[in-house]
Every structure is written in structure tokens, then in C-alpha cells.
């Protein structure tokens, strides 16, 4: 679907990416994560064409190559689209630009967004739903979602994610998330990419990743095991092992615990706030 080749990008003199490479698979949900400032949102903006790389290229397959932005939806972390317009005016403008005859506003009705409201009067959650509604009207093949969804209330977040699941099921839409809170989306993610220092530190299918990272609770250090990260307490310690193998269970003096995605990512970044 998307191929990033030898990409470099700087903010002023600060280098964010240098000779960066990535393949995004069609029909998959990819999660991009890492500590704040590592370049997650920048990477989405580069894919979306909002930012331009200093060198390298971003290639799209034949279904998108002629006009990538026509087949792509980008929900950024600001959602400031059409703020000065009424909902109805923004819809009309969007329909004229994209030559849309029939506009489905059922999501707007479900979330109490009125056509006579100004965009600036909508809550953050309503703006996200409105933006998603505009995107859906163009029948996107690729959807890029920044971390804005965790700024909206539980109900609207649920509406958003249910619609996303429908899209993936019915339309085989490719989705790329940038995310700091994984509990809402963990069950729909196929692949996890963790960025560190402008490089890919981890790139795993989610089930493979969960099988490879385990927590060992023990009062003695596990011998000759690859400890990724540890947390010390008064009477015991938690050891995060990667890559974990089943045979290691015979070598540990303590319990082996399965981890959710939040705990796994925290282990990789050494417990830093993400």
C-alpha cells in the first residue's frame, strides 16, 4: 500500500528521520508508537503529504498512485478543519471539491451534530466525528489517525471505533494509528511499530509481540535471560523478558505473567512516559 524509502526529515537543524524505511501493508491496522517527540505524528504528516521530506520518497501502490490524497483520509491531532463555516457550508464545499452526489450524515445525527452549527461550536469529539464523516464520503483506501481520539469522550470514541471496525470489515481500509493509549484499540491492531531515535526499534505482529514479551515476578534475578527492563520493589522485582521463549519457564524462580500492549510498550521505552 505505502512504501517509504530512504526518507530523511529535519525540523530546523534537528534531524527526525535519516534514511528511514517502512512498508505499510494493505488491509492491515498498524500502530505507530514511542516516546513523545520521537516523530510519530511527523511520520503521519509525511505520509499524508502535509510535510515534505528533505530526501527520499513515499510511494503508493497502483490503486492510489495517480492521486494519493484523493484516496486518503487524515485525522490530525488538531481537527481545525473549516472552523469558520457552518456544518452545512462545510459539507457543501466538500461535496463540490470531491464531486460527491450523496452525502451520508447518519453519523452526525447519531452524535447530535446539527447542520446549522458553526464548526468552532462543536466539541472536540463532535469535530472528530464530523471530520470522519467527510472522509468516509470520499471512500478512502488509507486512513491515518493521530492521537486525537483519546481527547474525546467515551461515547463518541465508541462511535468512532465502531465505524472504523465497520470500514475495515466491509471496505478493507488500511489504517495507521499514532497512539499513546492502547486499551481502546488493542483488539483491532495487527502490527506494532515502535520508533526510537528516528529508527524502527520494534516491528512485530501484535500476537507475536505478546508471545515474545513476558513479565517474571521473582525475588532473585533470572539467570542468563534477556531482561529488557526491570522494576525493583522492597521484596521482589519485575523482570520484562524479550524475546521470551517457552523453555525459559524452567529457568525462572517466580511467576511468568502475560502482558497487555501498554505494559509491553512501557517495557521497551524503559518506563518513560509515552
Task: Explain the meaning of each model-derived region.
Residues 48:
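Helix-to-loop junction immediately C-terminal to a conserved catalytic motif
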Residues 56-68:
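Conserved ABC transporter NBD signature motif
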Residues 229, 233-274:
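C-terminal coupling/interaction segments
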Residues 33-35:
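The feature captures the beta-strand-to-loop junction immediately N-terminal to the Walker
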Amino acid at each position: 500500500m505505502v512504501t517509504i524509502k530512504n526518507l530523511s526529515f529535519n525540523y530546523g537543524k534537528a534531524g527526525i528521520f535519516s534514511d528511514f524505511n517502512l512498508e505499510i501493508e494493505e488491509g492491515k491496522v498498524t500502530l505507530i508508537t514511542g516516546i513523545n517527540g520521537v516523530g510519530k505524528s511527523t511520520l503521519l504528516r509525511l505520509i499524508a503529504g502535509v510535510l515534505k521530506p528533505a530526501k527520499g520518497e513515499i510511494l503508493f501502490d497502483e490503486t492510489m498512485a495517480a492521486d494519493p490524497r484523493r484516496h486518503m483520509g487524515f485525522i490530525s491531532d488538531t481537527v481545525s478543519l473549516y472552523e469558520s463555516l457552518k456544518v452545512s457550508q462545510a459539507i457543501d464545499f466538500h461535496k463540490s471539491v470531491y464531486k460527491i452526489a450523496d452525502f451520508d450524515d447518519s453519523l452526525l445525527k447519531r452524535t447530535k451534530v446539527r447542520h446549522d452549527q458553526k464548526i468552532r461550536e462543536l466539541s472536540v469529539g463532535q469535530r472528530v466525528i464530523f471530520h470522519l464523516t467527510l472522509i468516509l464520503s470520499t471512500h478512502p483506501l488509507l486512513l491515518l489517525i493521530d492521537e486525537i481520539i483519546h481527547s474525546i469522550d467515551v461515547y463518541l470514541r465508541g462511535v468512532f471505533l465502531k465505524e472504523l471496525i465497520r470500514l475495515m470489515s466491509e471496505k478493507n481500509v488500511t489504517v495507521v494509528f499514532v497512539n499513546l493509549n492502547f486499551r481502546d484499540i488493542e483488539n483491532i491492531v495487527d502490527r506494532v511499530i515502535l520508533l526510537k531515535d528516528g529508527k524502527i526499534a520494534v516491528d512485530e505482529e501484535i500476537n507475536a509481540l505478546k508471545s515474545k514479551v513476558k513479565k517474571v515476578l521473582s525475588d532473585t534475578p533470572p539467570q542468563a535471560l534477556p531482561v529488557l527492563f526491570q522494576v525493583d520493589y522492597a521484596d521482589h522485582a519485575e523482570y520484562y523478558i524479550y524475546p521470551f521463549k517457552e523453555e525459559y519457564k524452567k529457568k525462572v524462580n517466580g511467576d511468568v505473567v502475560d502482558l497487555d500492549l501498554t505494559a509491553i510498550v512501557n517495557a521497551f521505552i524503559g518506563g518513560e512516559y509515552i
